[in-house]
Each structure stands twice: as structure tokens, then as C-alpha cells.
């Protein structure tokens, strides 16, 4: 049901258990939707619908009372995506794209300021030769190590 996989490690066991509970809950919701859609109004369909509704309630209760559930906070934006019927993986992809663009913009600014520092330092060194040592010290302290 999910598009990503969680690596089987000891520290991931709570996350795997929660993911399994959520997957089972999603399946129950799908089955409940089918039962509601195909409801014929008979006693048998009413009993099946009641049973499935009670199953969903118990699964929700189990998920809520699980000690692992509160370990993994879910962003409100993801919940909004799900409520709007959208795929939460789209939120993740869009978030990564926005972050990548922001990082690229910041990298460009850093390069521009580094170039400004170098050009300004060179011009100041040409005009004020006695400041060359201070300018070189500033350049050395403000140049990131790679």
C-alpha cells in the first residue's frame, strides 16, 4: 500500500509496527467503503456493516493507545493532504523540491558574498596596503572549509 519501505532494523521496530497498523486501518476503511456502497438494506448487510465499523473503531483505538504512535509526529500539512484526498508522498516530494530550490538560492548568495568579499578585499588592499594582513585574516576566517 505504501510507496516507500522502512528498513528492518531494531530501532525501526516501533515504526514498522505503526506502519502495519496504519496499513491495516486503511484496508479496513476501503472495505467499509465497499460495504457502505453495496449495502442492500438487509439484516445480513447491516450485520456486516456493524461488524466492520466496530473493527475500524477498535483499530483506531489500538492505534491511538499504542505507545509508539506518539513517538513519530506527523506534520499538520500531511494530515491536511490526506484529508483532502491527496497522496502524502506528493507533500514529501514538494517539500524536498522547495528545500532544494531554497538551498540552491542560499548557495548562490553565499558564492556572491564570497566573491564580493574577495573583490572588496582586493580593492581595499590596493588602496590601503597597510591593511593587507587584516584583510587576509578576514578572508581566512570567512572562507568555509571544504
Swiss-Prot record:
Pfam families: Med10. InterPro entries: Mediator_Med10. The keyword rRNA-binding does not apply. Keywords: Activator, Nucleus, Transcription, Transcription regulation. One of its GO terms (cellular component) is mediator complex. GO terms for biological process: regulation of transcription by RNA polymerase II. The keyword Transcription applies. It is found in: Nucleus. GO terms for molecular function: transcription coregulator activity. Transmembrane segments: none annotated. Component of the Mediator complex. Belongs to the Mediator complex subunit 10 family. Component of the Mediator complex, a coactivator involved in the regulated transcription of nearly all RNA polymerase II-dependent genes. Mediator functions as a bridge to convey information from gene-specific regulatory proteins to the basal RNA polymerase II transcription machinery. Mediator is recruited to promoters by direct interactions with regulatory proteins and serves as a scaffold for the assembly of a functional preinitiation complex with RNA polymerase II and the general transcription factors. This is Mediator of RNA polymerase II transcription subunit 10. It comes from Scheffersomyces stipitis (strain ATCC 58785 / CBS 6054 / NBRC 10063 / NRRL Y-11545) (Yeast).
